[in-house]
């Protein structure tokens, strides 16, 4: 999303991170509000502040981050001088626990709908919050609590064809060591297994594969742009990808001169082959 939305003319997306307790203590003691990583701009000076929520335990982080940024936590307490507050991610499949704090919520895949939201925000920057929310509400996957009133069922945003969706081949490369210190390509989305314990297997339905040719193309571009020596073939169950053998062989063949490593997360034992 960082790459896709920053390609929208007139729109700038910056990152921010909730601090640990010791840093938060120092920020509060020195009256330092939460700010963005790129330009060090205070969050309350942006037009929109968004949160990506993967787990329910992240909910308090949102409220604390807003408070640290000097932004009222409750939606009805925020006037025109404050940014719109939104959230997305797997935990927003059920937005009700957080709806009193958020202006709008994105439910489902974000690649397409977030770009459309960015275009609306740029085109109607001078409109009131309510006018912008009314325009955003018309998009698939967008839930605006103050406008909804139970009048319709929200249709989850789904990227139907991964091959026709722009991908972030210009992946951000950090200058410190991180846990997943490698290029990452999502080879497929969704899972056909339907294990009852797995939230992601339900949330990311239906199963959609990116073609062998497209995956190889993305990997080639990403390695050239990032300089990584390893690539992760990411999905909920990588060994269920229909052409996993051909993909691995293709990656190794095209990158033999680079000695590129291949990482395969989330493998099922019953789909392993000798090869």
Kindly give the residue locations of the regions a language model identified.
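Conserved SAM/AdoMet-binding glycine-rich loop
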Residues: 57, 221-275
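N-terminal pre-triad scaffold of radical SAM enzymes
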Residues: 5, 173-196, 223
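Conserved, mostly hydrophobic/aromatic
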Residues: 49, 103, 191, 195, ...
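N-terminal [4Fe-4S]-dependent radical SAM core
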Residues: 145-184
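A short beta-strand-loop structural module common to alpha/beta enzyme folds
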Residues: 10-22
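Short helix-loop-beta junction
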Residues: 3-12, 253-255
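Glycine-rich beta-alpha loop elements in corrinoid/cobalamin-binding modules
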Residues: 19-151
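Iron-sulfur (Fe-S) cluster-binding segments and ferredoxin-like electron-carrier domains
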Residues: 198-214
């Amino acid at each position: 999303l960082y790459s896709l939305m920053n390609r929208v003319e007139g729109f700038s997306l910056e990152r921010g991170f909730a601090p640990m307790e010791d840093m938060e203590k120092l920020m509060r003691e020195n009256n330092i509000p939460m700010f963005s990583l790129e330009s060090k701009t205070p969050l309350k000076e942006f037009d929109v502040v968004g949160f990506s929520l993967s787990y329910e335990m992240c909910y308090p982080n949102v409220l604390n981050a807003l408070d640290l940024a000097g932004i009222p936590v409750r939606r009805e307490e925020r006037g025109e001088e404050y940014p719109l507050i939104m959230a997305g991610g797997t935990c927003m499949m059920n937005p009700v626990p957080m709806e009193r704090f958020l202006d709008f919520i994105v439910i489902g895949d974000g690649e397409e709908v977030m770009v459309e939201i960015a275009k609306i925000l740029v085109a109607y920057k001078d409109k009131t919050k309510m006018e912008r929310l009314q325009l955003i509400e018309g998009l698939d996957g967008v839930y605006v609590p103050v406008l909804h009133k139970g009048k319709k069922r929200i249709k989850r945003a789904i990227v139907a064809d991964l091959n026709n969706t722009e991908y972030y081949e210009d992946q951000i490369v950090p200058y410190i060591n991180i846990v997943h210190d490698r290029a990452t390509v999502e080879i497929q989305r969704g899972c056909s297994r339907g294990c009852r314990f797995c939230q992601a297997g339900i949330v990311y339905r239906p199963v959609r594969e990116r073609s062998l040719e497209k995956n190889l193309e993305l990997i080639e571009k990403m390695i050239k742009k990032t300089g990584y020596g390893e690539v992760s073939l990411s999905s909920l169950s990588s060994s269920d990808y229909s052409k996993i053998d051909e993909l691995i062989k293709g990656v190794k063949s095209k990158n033999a001169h680079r000695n590129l490593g291949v990482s395969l997360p989330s493998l099922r034992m019953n789909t392993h082959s000798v090869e």
